Amino acid sequence: MGKLYVFDHPLIQHKITYIRDKNTGTKEFRELVDEVASLMAFEITRDLPLEEIEIETPVSKAKTKVIAGKKLGLIPILRAGLGMVDGILKLIPAAKVGHIGLYRDPKTLQPVEYYVKLPTDVEERDFIVLDPMLATGGSAAEAINSLKKRGAKHIKLMCIVAAPEGVKVVQEEHPDVDIYVAALDEKLNDHGYVVPGLGDAGDRLFGTK
C-alpha cells in the first residue's frame, strides 16, 4: 500500500489558512499555491539519490554532492494543477512538464480525459502528479492510469488538500503510489467537494466561475 504523507510544517500550515479563506483574492491565492508547492517539493524530493563529484572552489579542490542524474517529470492535471508547476520549477528547473487534461462529469463525478502531452522518455522519468485538491480521487487515479499505460513506473501524487475518500481510492487503485498532502481534511460533501476544503481551486486560481 502506498504511503500517505501529511506535511505539518508551520510555514505550510500558515499559508494553507489563507488559501482556504474565501476572502483571499485571485492574486494572493495564486501566490500562496505557488509557495506551498515549493515548500512541498522540498520535502517530496528528500529521497533523491546523490552522487559525489569533484569541483574546484576559489580556495581548493573539493568533493561535493549533486543529484544523481534522476530525470523528473511534473504532470499537472489541467487546469488547477498548473498553479503548482512554477513553484516546483523554481527548485527543479530542469524538470520536464507534461499535461493531462481531465474534467469531472457533474452528474457521475467520474473523470473524462480530453488531453495528454508527455515527455518522450516516459519510462526513464520519476513523475510527480499535481492537483491542488484530492476529492473523490477519480481524476488523480485516472491521471496515474494514463501515465502507467504509457510506460511510467515511478509516480508520486502531490496535493494541497485531500479528503479521506480520495486517498482511499488512489491507494486502492494504485498501491505503488505514495501520496503527499499539505492537509488531510474531514470529508466530501454531497457535491463531491472537500470539506472544509478551499472551494474550486481552478476557479480561484484563474478568476473564473
Swiss-Prot record:
Q: Which reaction does it catalyse?
A: UMP + diphosphate = 5-phospho-alpha-D-ribose 1-diphosphate + uracil
Report the EC number(s), separated by commas if there are several. Answer: 2.4.2.9
Q: Keyword annotations for this protein? A: Allosteric enzyme, Glycosyltransferase, GTP-binding, Magnesium, Nucleotide-binding, Transferase
- Glycosyltransferase recorded as keyword: yes
- Enumerate the residues binding 5-phospho-alpha-D-ribose 1-diphosphate: 79, 104, 131-139, 200
Q: What protein family is recorded?
A: Belongs to the UPRTase family.
PANTHER family in UniProt: ADENINE PHOSPHORIBOSYLTRANSFERASE, URACIL PHOSPHORIBOSYLTRANSFERASE, CHLOROPLASTIC
Protein name, as recorded: Uracil phosphoribosyltransferase
- From what organism does this protein derive? Bacillus cytotoxicus (strain DSM 22905 / CIP 110041 / 391-98 / NVH 391-98)
Q: What taxonomic classification does the UniProt entry list for its organism?
A: Bacteria, Bacillati, Bacillota, Bacilli, Bacillales
